[in-house]
Every structure is written in C-alpha cells, then in structure tokens.
Amino acid sequence: VGETRKASKEDLQKESLVRFKNAVRHGTTTIEIKSGYGLEKETEIKQLKVANWLGTLGLADTVVTYMGAHAIPDDMDRYTYVASVLKNLEELRELAEFCDVFCEEGVFTEEESRTILEAARNAGFGLKIHADEFGDTGGGKLAAELRVISADHLAGSTLETIQALRDSGVIGVLLPGTPLAILSDHFAPARKMIANNLPIAIATDCNPNCYTESMQLIQQLAVFRMGMTPAESLVASTINAALAIGKTDRGCIAEGWKADLLICDIPDYRHLTYHFGINHVETVIIDGKVIDA
C-alpha cells in the first residue's frame, strides 16, 4: 500500500504494462483488474485510471473493479474508513464496472460488507466479494443473499454455503495460486462444488502475495491440487471466467461469439495441464486480430 501510494501514475503504468503483456503472452484475452492497494481516494483513483488505460492499448480487453474495501488502512479506524468508502462510491463509479469487498475475519465484517455492497449497487456497480478464504465466516452466505455476480476464494465454504451460492446464481471464482504462494494446503473444495452444480471459474489472483500472470499454471493447479479434470479447468478459465465478469459474448468457439482464440503447440487440450511448467501459447488472437504483446 505504501509503495502504491508513493508511485506516480507513470510508474504504475510502466510496471503494470509488463504484467499485462505477460498475461496476454500466456493466453489471457480479457483481464479483470482490481484496485485496493491505495486504501485512500486519490491512490484508488490512480489505480483505476491505470487499469482503464491498459484497456485502451489494443492488447486485451479489461474489466475494472473498485476494491477500496480490501483492508483497513493503518492510518484510519475502521468506522471512518468504511464511511470514506461509502462516500466515494458515486464518484468512482465512472472508473469501474464492479465493486468488491474482502469479507473475512480480521478484514471487513459481514455487516460492513453488506453496507458497502448495497450502497455500491445503488451507485450502479455490479457486485463481487472475496469470501470464506480461511473458513465459512459468512461472506459466502452474504454473496448468496445479495446475488453478487461472483465470489472469490471460497476455500472454507461449507456445503450449505455452496448450495446457497448455486441457488443464487453466483459464480465461484477459485484461486489456487494463493494457497500455493502462502505454503498452505487449504485449497477450495472444487470437487464438492462441481458435484453440487455450482459453476466455478479459476483466476490467477495476481498480486504481491500471489505473483503470477500465468493462467496455464492456474489450470495446472486446479487439476493437481483441486482435483478438477483438464476439461473442467478449461471451462473454468474460459466461458465460466467470462460469466464471472459479466461477459456473455466470449469464452466459447462458436458462430457469433467474440473471436478470442489461442493457438497452442500441443496435441490436444489435455496437454495444457499434463505438460506443465512451460508456456504453450504460440499465437494470441483477440477479436479476430493477432496480438503482438
């Protein structure tokens, strides 16, 4: 947070562009970018503007999410900070499509998260939530109650919560890179979710705590550590991932769908996870155009 506050907009553009290009080279064609490392209005705006700028470069599509409610900053008490997040929602709506809150023990309470998300909905944001990363602490149930578009993490969600998410039409976004990075064996129960018909997506969670831009690595972790099949990991990183950011025109190779395609040097799709540790992508095509990242 401190480094992000000190960085100029140009610094953030330069550093973010490197990561953005890495993601594209590894096969990501639509990228959700979240703020949350400013924890005060000016730096959150700076991050959101850089995220929007990346989407203008013609390298990949972007979806921008405001996540001012990522943590309580050290220089402010929680009541004052929640009030500041609420105050800024209307102004920040023009810079972001979605609003996300980290509802977890030690971060934002269920009631604080509900207050922020309901206000965000009234301001015109789509809703997302980080929930149940370490245990079933109410975030997943809140996601179901508010019918958010997606809920991230869910490693600690119980069967009751999984079924509530399913019944509310929420997409579960699983982030297997995160437990890997923090040396944890606490991966999301993907098999239980699939058995109970909860649609799941997977994502990198690329951040200082989980530093990877490679969706191929995430697919591999989904198979090796969460028990998903190669086909399930492919669905979770394409059409389901698109649905988790509100996109219904991509993620499938079919007539009338957006022509976002990857040409990979593999015998069939199963080698994306079977042959791990390398980049299989040879050519990235976005909206029918070959991309040089």
What are these regions (language model features)?
Residues 2-17, 21, 29-137, 208:
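Metal-coordinating catalytic core of metallo-dependent amide/deamination hydrolases
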Residues 24, 92-93, 121, 144, ...:
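Non-catalytic positions within long, well-ordered alpha-helices that form the structural scaffold/packing
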Residues 126, 136-252, 265, 276, ...:
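Active-site-adjacent C-terminal substructures of enzyme catalytic domains
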Residues 256-259:
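Loop/turn positions that initiate beta-strands
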Residues 269-274:
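Short, Lys/Arg- and Gly-enriched loop/turn segments at beta-strand edges
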Residues 284:
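Short aromatic-centered micro-motifs
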